[in-house]
Design a protein with these regions (language model features):
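Non-catalytic nucleic-acid substrate-recognition regions in nucleic-acid-modifying enzymes
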Residues: 17-155
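Basic Arg/Gly/Lys-rich low-complexity intrinsically disordered segments
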Residues: 1-17
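Non-catalytic, regulatory and substrate/membrane-recognition segments associated with hydrolase enzymes
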Residues: 158
Length: 159
């Protein structure tokens, strides 16, 4: 039987530029349990909201959280954040995110889920479509191609 022992963050070589905001969604009511699991792994909590906790960690935190956290549905990497009051702002804000740093040239991706909170942008399918178009546009510009082939590994994206 494998037992994990938390040795804390002492001796870990991480710089702020290698830190990511990670989101751990969970079922409502399990936030305090999830918070304890994240703290036990030695990571800094950013926010606690209904059904999710945001925390900071390096690349190993992604793997460690996926292995040792039991109450989170999954571990998500926060790619960016911006305010969008219309679909043009959504497109431009999405396009401004450096997707090429996270998605390879041949990435196959789709927007799996789009949720809004008190927003005029309430059509999930329209949000998914706009986000997909903005990412493809960014990748086409970055790699200087006319057609963006999506024949590589799969990357689901949530908004």
């Amino acid at each position: 039987m494998f037992k994990y022992r938390n040795k804390g963050r002492k001796g870990r070589n991480t710089s702020m530029e290698n830190m990511y905001e990670l989101i751990a969604p969970c079922h409502f009511g399990l936030e305090s349990v999830l918070k304890r699991e994240i703290l036990d792994l030695g990571y800094e909590i950013v926010t606690v909201e209904d059904g999710r906790i945001t925390f900071r960690g390096d690349v190993t935190a992604i793997a460690r959280a996926n292995i040792f956290i039991r109450t989170a549905e999954r571990i998500l990497l926060k790619m960016g954040s911006f305010r969008a009051t219309d679909f043009d702002e959504l497109f431009e804000g999405t396009k401004a995110i450096p997707w090429e740093e996270f998605l390879p040239r041949d990435a196959k991706f789709w927007v799996t889920k789009a949720t809004t909170n008190k927003s005029a942008l309430f059509s999930a399918s329209a949000i998914q479509s706009i986000v997909k178009k903005a990412i493809v546009d960014r990748m086409k510009q970055t790699y200087r191609v006319e057609r963006f082939e999506e024949d590589g590994d799969e990357y689901p994206i949530r908004v």
